[in-house]
């Protein structure tokens, strides 16, 4: 990480690079989620960027973000995103915006892996407040993606 400027007492990076392979995936909600550019990894202050990979038949369980909007960009495969129970089909090179507080579930009903890049912003006041599960997660003993702290 290169330091070029200061914001108050916090050092802010002018640029920071993270290899996806260097970030351990979380399987807590289903699929494979990696929080890439985060407050803890690069000092991000306004949101964070991540990657989700879902094998055919996998899904990310329903949840919502009380403080944040979610931006999704599908780079491979196809997905069904259920937003408040309504299905939105997402194909490769399509993007979806989910406003804060909306319940959403991400499903790969296709026969090839799906890969999606997501951005969540603004940040919640504390990482543990930023995500609320609304259905049981398939791997409750697994750690959530590391965003802060």
From Swiss-Prot:
Residues 127-149 are annotated as: Disordered. The keyword Transferase applies. One of its GO terms (molecular function) is transferase activity. Keywords: Antibiotic biosynthesis, Transferase. Pathway: Antibiotic biosynthesis; tetracenomycin C biosynthesis. Residues 51-117 form the Cupin type-2 domain. The tetracenomycin polyketide synthase (TCM PKS) is composed of a ketosynthase complex (TcmKL), an acyl carrier protein (TcmM), a cyclase (TcmN) and a probable second cyclase (TcmJ). Involved in the biosynthesis of tetracenomycin C (TCM C). Part of a type II polyketide synthase (PKS) that catalyzes the synthesis of tetracenomycin F2 (TCM F2), a precursor of TCM C, from malonyl-CoA. TcmJ, while not absolutely required, greatly increases the tetracenomycin F2 production. It probably acts as a cyclase. This is Tetracenomycin polyketide synthase protein TcmJ. It comes from Streptomyces glaucescens. The lineage of its organism: Bacteria, Bacillati, Actinomycetota, Actinomycetes, Kitasatosporales. The gene is tcmJ.
């Amino acid at each position: 990480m290169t330091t070029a400027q200061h914001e108050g007492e916090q050092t802010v990076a002018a640029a920071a690079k993270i290899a996806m392979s260097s970030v351990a995936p979380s399987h807590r909600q289903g699929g494979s989620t990696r929080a890439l550019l985060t407050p803890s990894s690069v000092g991000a202050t306004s949101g964070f960027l991540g990657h989700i990979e879902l094998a055919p038949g996998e899904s990310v369980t329903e949840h919502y973000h009380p403080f944040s909007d979610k931006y999704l960009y599908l780079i491979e495969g196809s997905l069904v995103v259920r937003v408040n129970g309504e299905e939105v089909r997402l194909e490769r090179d399509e993007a979806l915006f989910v406003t804060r507080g909306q319940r959403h579930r991400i499903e790969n009903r296709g026969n090839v892996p799906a890969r999606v890049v997501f951005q969540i912003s603004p940040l919640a006041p504390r990482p543990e407040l930023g995500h609320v599960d609304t259905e049981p997660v398939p791997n409750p003993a697994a750690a959530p993606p590391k965003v802060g702290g």
